[in-house]
């Protein structure tokens, strides 16, 4: 071998060789297969090209590591829950504390609820552990960024679908949160996305007032051109999925037949300004709408008449949504007066639009327990959603990009109910987005929250693991001298609760370094009328 051919390079090639080791004469035995790995060492020559220069490593590159993609796999939690149910073990959520050794005991959010959706434990700390999205997971960005107007999880929870100002649908993986697909769905911004209760259809409404019908494969099968004169703000399906309602900035609500959608079946008139939100109750014959005229109206979809109007809001009502689980008799409303209100439909006086334009129900006075006010927001509330498995948990997003989680069963500040008091958040994520949080949606199992904002980002949040120092602190995770405050764990012996508890330090992330508002430690008390 000539010397100018270059240095010798050794290459090791593994080759799999399959050999039958023997046969068994028993009729039910098959031949066993033994696999051997044979390593062959080969030598080859390699001539470097003329002018070859070794790559210079940039300064500081040796410290770089491959990017780690976070994955949220809830299979282990469901597996443990299934085994516990088969073995007849009882769940004791009061034993869940902020210490890393309790990670193995973490169960799915639905494991901590009763049949009616209420928490099995009266310990508010369990709500924080099981249902509070306090851990940042991943940010999802399109190659060409546009404000995110709407987001919804697919019914199976495997993917997330977002709609942007450019009219694009973007499909994200629900476990690794990476990009999967993108398509041009509308010619203008996608303002609303809604899956049917059966999961077989998807409706989308855009900024120009058009409605499109989609199959789960995102195949468009029907279009209603100019369903409204102005932007469609929200859509909602009837419990049977045979009808749906749309709300628009033209001040009208329209009820459509899903199979005969050429013309609106009925038009609901009564709002004096833009309709910002609409929802159809999953059991009752009720439609709720919120408007820029500072009013909330309840409608009878059969007669297309207004059956009640709620006065007393100080600004635009941006979001109205019925309770999806539990008793399903609560109504949540987010307003641009920096508050949210929880209304109990069972304790409200009836009113009728036929009595005059001002007929309706005023906001309850102090001491009236038909309403609870959720306070503590740093700016106007633009988005609101209920937790899918915990009937007493509500999450809201504000204009400044913060996300708040409330437990409506806690005692209002001041110990009284009414518009002058308020329930404070159990967890706050300051500056979750750089600007307004335009949409919020929980995973069907409730362990992951998606938020979309006008900062052109989609972010994913999960409940923190016990003792996770990087999660955002709440009043139940607030570190004390010996770890978690014992008085936030009612029913747990002080001596045993202090044993083995590590001090939880709060580690700020690069994007979220705003100080969290101080929250008082109030003992949880169920609100009469909110009982499930």
UniProtKB/Swiss-Prot annotation:
GO terms for cellular component: chromatin; mRNA cleavage and polyadenylation specificity factor complex. It is found in: Nucleus. The keyword Repeat applies. Gene3D superfamilies: YVTN repeat-like/Quinoprotein amine dehydrogenase. CDD domains: WD40 (cd00200). The gene is PFS2. WD repeats lie at residues 143-182, 185-224, 227-266, 270-309, 312-353, 376-416, 432-471. The keyword Repeat applies. It comes from Yarrowia lipolytica (strain CLIB 122 / E 150) (Yeast). Required for 3'-end cleavage and polyadenylation of pre-mRNAs. Also involved in chromosome segregation where it has a role in chromosome attachment to the mitotic spindle. This is Polyadenylation factor subunit 2. GO terms for biological process: chromosome segregation; co-transcriptional mRNA 3'-end processing, cleavage and polyadenylation pathway. Disulfide bonds: none annotated. PANTHER family: PRE-MRNA 3' END PROCESSING PROTEIN WDR33, WD40 REPEAT PROTEIN. SUPFAM superfamilies: WD40 repeat-like. Residues 61-72 have a biased composition (Basic and acidic residues). Residues 50-72, 513-532 are annotated as: Disordered. Keywords: Chromosome partition, mRNA processing, Nucleus, Repeat, WD repeat.
């Amino acid at each position: 071998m000539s010397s100018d051919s270059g240095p010798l390079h050794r290459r090791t090639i593994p080759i799999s060789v399959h050999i039958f080791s023997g046969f068994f004469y028993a009729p039910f035995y098959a031949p066993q297969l033994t696999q051997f790995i044979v390593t062959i060492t080969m030598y080859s020559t390699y001539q470097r090209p003329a002018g070859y220069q070794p790559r210079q490593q940039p300064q500081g590159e040796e410290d770089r590591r491959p990017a780690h993609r976070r994955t949220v796999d809830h299979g282990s939690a469901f597996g443990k829950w299934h085994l516990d149910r088969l073995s007849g073990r009882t769940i004791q959520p009061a034993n869940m504390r902020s210490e890393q050794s309790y990670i193995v005991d973490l169960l799915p959010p639905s494991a901590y609820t009763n049949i009616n959706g209420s928490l099995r434990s009266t310990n508010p700390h369990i709500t924080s552990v099981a249902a509070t999205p306090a851990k940042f997971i991943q940010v999802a960005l399109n190659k060409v960024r546009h404000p995110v107007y709407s987001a919804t999880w697919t019914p199976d929870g495997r993917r997330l679908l977002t709609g942007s100002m450019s009219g694009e649908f973007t499909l994200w993986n629900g476990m690794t949160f990476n990009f999967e697909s993108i398509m041009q769905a509308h010619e203008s911004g996608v303002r609303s996305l809604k899956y049917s209760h059966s999961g077989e259809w998807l409706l989308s409404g855009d900024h120009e007032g058009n409605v499109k019908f989609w199959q789960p494969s995102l195949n468009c099968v029907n279009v209603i051109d100019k369903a409204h004169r102005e932007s469609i703000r929200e859509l909602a399906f009837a419990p049977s999925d045979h009808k749906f309602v749309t709300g628009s900035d033209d001040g009208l609500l329209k009820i459509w037949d899903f199979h005969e959608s050429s013309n609106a079946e009925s038009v609901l008139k009564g709002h004096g300004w833009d309709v910002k939100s609409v929802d159809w109750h999953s059991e009752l014959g009720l439609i709720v709408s919120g408007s820029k005229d500072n009013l909330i109206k309840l409608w009878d979809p059969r007669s297309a008449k207004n059956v009640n109007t709620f006065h007393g809001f100080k600004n635009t009502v941006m979001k109205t949504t019925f309770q999806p689980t539990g008793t399903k008799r609560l109504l949540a409303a987010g307003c641009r007066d920096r508050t949210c209100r929880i209304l109990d439909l069972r304790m409200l006086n009836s009113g009728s639009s036929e009595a005059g334009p001002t007929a309706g129900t005023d906001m309850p006075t102090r001491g009236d327990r038909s309403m609870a006010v959720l306070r503590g927001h740093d700016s106007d509330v633009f988005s609101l959603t209920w937790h899918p498995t915990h009937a007493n948990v509500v999450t809201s997003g504000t204009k400044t990009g913060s996300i708040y989680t409330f437990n409506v069963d806690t005692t209002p500040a001041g110990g009284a109910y009414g518009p002058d008091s308020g329930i404070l958040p159990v967890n706050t994520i300051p500056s979750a987005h750089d600007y307004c949080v335009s949409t919020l949606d929980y995973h069907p199992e409730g362990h992951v929250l998606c938020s979309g904002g006008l900062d052109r980002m989609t972010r994913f949040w999960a409940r923190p693991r016990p003792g996770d120092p990087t999660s955002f602190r709440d009043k139940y995770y607030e570190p004390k001298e010996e770890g978690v405050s014992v008085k936030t764990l009612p029913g747990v012996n002080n001596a045993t609760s202090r044993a083995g508890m590590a001090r939880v330090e709060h580690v700020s992330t690069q994007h979220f370094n705003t100080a969290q508002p101080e929250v008082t430690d109030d003992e949880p008390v169920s609100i009469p009328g909110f009982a499930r």
